[in-house]
Amino acid sequence: MYPAHLLVLLAVCVSLLGASAISNRPRNLVQFSELIQCVNKGKRATYHYMDYGCYCGKGGSGTPVDALDRCCKTHDDCYGQAEKKGCFPLLSLYNFACFPGAPQCGKGNTCQRFVCACDLKAALCFAKSPYNNNNYNIDIKKKCQTLIYMRLQTQ
């Protein structure tokens, strides 16, 4: 085999090894979870926020059901602003320090700092908002409709 062929083969193998290490779960969500735990000092598991109200979790619609759900809508809106700036919030990895009572975002590029700020603001909002067990795993088709959609259904 020629040396050039060996180099190409080596490059392909290295590329495949690197691709196999990529997680299919957005890594930023792991950091967001760690930030939530830092702020709430482990008092509530992160998964409690994944299916809460109309906005905590994937997507969101309608009117937030309470203050905690408004935190999630604000977080979604913040990620929307990050996307408008050309950032990919679910893939943006950032550094933060978990100082008691005052977690701080670390240095990084514009997107990393912006996304960290979104996550930090949401984590702080979660910590100060009451958690209503009745708003966990609600029927979003019934409780999270927009007013226009609800009016069309009643006509």
From Swiss-Prot:
GO-annotated biological processes: arachidonate secretion; lipid catabolic process; phospholipid metabolic process
Disulfide bonds: 38-98, 54-144, 56-72, 71-125, 78-118, 87-111, 105-116
Residue ranges of the propeptide: 22-27
UniProt cross-references to SUPFAM superfamilies, sorted A to Z: Phospholipase A2, PLA2
Signal peptide segment: 1-21
Locations listed in the record: Secreted
Active site positions, chain numbering: 75, 119
Pfam families attached to this UniProt entry: Phospholip_A2_1
Reaction(s) catalysed by this chain's protein: a 1,2-diacyl-sn-glycero-3-phosphocholine + H2O = a 1-acyl-sn-glycero-3-phosphocholine + a fatty acid + H(+)
Top-level division of the source organism's lineage: Eukaryota
Gene Ontology, cellular component aspect: extracellular region
Binding site for Ca(2+): 55, 57, 59, 76
Any one Gene Ontology molecular-function term assigned to this protein's record: calcium-dependent phospholipase A2 activity
Presence of the UniProt keyword Lipid metabolism in the record: yes
Cofactors: Ca(2+)
InterPro entries in the record: PLipase_A2, PLipase_A2_Asp_AS, PLipase_A2_dom, PLipase_A2_dom_sf, PLipase_A2_His_AS
Enzyme class, spelled out: hydrolase
Keywords from the UniProt entry: Calcium, Disulfide bond, Hydrolase, Lipid degradation, Lipid metabolism, Metal-binding, Neurotoxin, Presynaptic neurotoxin, Secreted, Signal, Toxin
Protein's UniProt keywords contain Secreted: yes
Cofactor-binding details, from the entry: Binds 1 Ca(2+) ion.
Sequence similarity: Belongs to the phospholipase A2 family. Group I subfamily. D49 sub-subfamily.
Role, per record: Snake venom phospholipase A2 (PLA2) that inhibits neuromuscular transmission by blocking acetylcholine release from the nerve termini. PLA2 catalyzes the calcium-dependent hydrolysis of the 2-acyl groups in 3-sn-phosphoglycerides.
Protein name: Basic phospholipase A2 PC1
Organism: Laticauda colubrina (Yellow-lipped sea krait)
Lineage: Eukaryota, Metazoa, Chordata, Craniata, Vertebrata
